[in-house]
A protein has these predicted regions:
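Ligand-binding pockets and gating/stacking loops
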Residues: 1-304
């Protein structure tokens, strides 16, 4: 089982400083290991498939088990050679090797889990060829990969970025030959406002496709949507003014009955978004004292 998947639709191809002295890394990923370590986001559905099922090109159990055993054999060879090397190097190099061995053991643990799950009946799906030609096809294929990952319990945590900040992607397929960022600074121009609204509605319609897939996929006594907890939104409440407070966010899924939906909740001005993150973790059985700049939990979130 993978600890998490970080996925996106736009390549990260910008470097340096992007906005008011902040690193472009903040535009390229929305998932971080810690305050200083960004997690790279995968954009190729083929690579996502390989990460989930290996490079066999199929979800067939027999083929997957054969590949798993080959991987285990290679890993055993690597571990043996590193252990021999560890006995001959100095303290500094030994520390580096120990760090490497920790990573190897993590891979070994994943192989063991894969072996245990190799007979599980999986949906018959062939490996994607690569990135589709249109944004819509790309988004839907990446959503399909996410449903498959949850359905097979190969991960329980996914971060997905529909669009990179400052991306130059245009949306000709919906009649908008402009990119999202310049149209979001619409300056109350009706033509630009119409364009950015079209893009936002397009993104939301694709997200609705994902929700329908989750709702149609059985999981336990309900569906994946009943048991998932997902946050959908953006980093600006008014992009025209670069206003990043009072964010309009949507929380979806039932978290196994821990969260009641169908409501519009408004919180006190200045409430950190990390309070929401902290509460979401708690609802999914991961209690923490704090996260980032959190000041507490959102007590109104339950309502069940």
């Amino acid at each position: 089982q993978l600890g998490s998947l970080e996925l996106a639709l736009d390549q990260s191809d910008v470097f340096g400083s992007c906005d008011i002295g902040f690193s472009c890394q903040y535009t390229s990923t929305i998932s971080w290991r810690d305050s200083y370590t960004p997690l790279p986001m995968e954009t190729n559905p083929r690579a996502v498939f390989e990460r989930l099922f290996g490079d066999t090109g199929t979800t067939d159990p027999a083929v997957r088990l054969q590949r798993i055993r080959k991987d285990r054999s290679l890993l055993d060879s690597v571990t043996e050679r590193v252990s021999e090397l560890n006995r001959t190097v100095g303290a500094g190099d030994r520390a580096k090797l120990d760090q490497y061995l920790d990573a190897v053991r993590d891979v070994e643990r994943r192989i063991q889990m894969a072996e245990a799950q190799s007979n599980r009946e999986l949906p018959q799906i062939e490996q994607p060829a690569g990135i589709p030609n249109t944004y819509e096809e790309h988004a839907k294929l990446m959503f399909d990969m996410q449903v498959l990952a949850y359905q097979t319990d190969l991960t329980r945590v996914i971060t997905f970025m529909l669009g990179r900040e400052l991306s130059g992607r245009t949306y000709a397929e919906i009649g908008v030959p402009d990119s999202h960022h310049p149209t979001s600074h619409h300056r109350d121009d009706p033509a630009l406002y119409e364009k950015v609204t079209k893009i936002n509605e397009f993104h939301t319609s694709l997200f609705a496709y994902y929700l329908d897939k989750l709702d149609a996929t059985p999981d336990g006594n309900g569906s994946l949507l009943d048991n998932i907890l997902m946050l959908y939104g953006a980093g600006m409440s008014d992009s025209n003014r670069h206003q990043n407070t009072g964010l309009p966010l949507v929380l979806l899924g039932g978290a196994g009955g821990a969260v009641k939906g169908g409501r519009h909740l408004r919180y006190t001005e200045g409430t950190p978004i990390s309070n929401l993150h902290l509460t979401m973790l708690e609802k999914m059985g991961i209690p923490m004292e704090s996260i980032a700049n959190s000041t507490g939990r959102l007590n109104l979130l339950s309502g069940v």
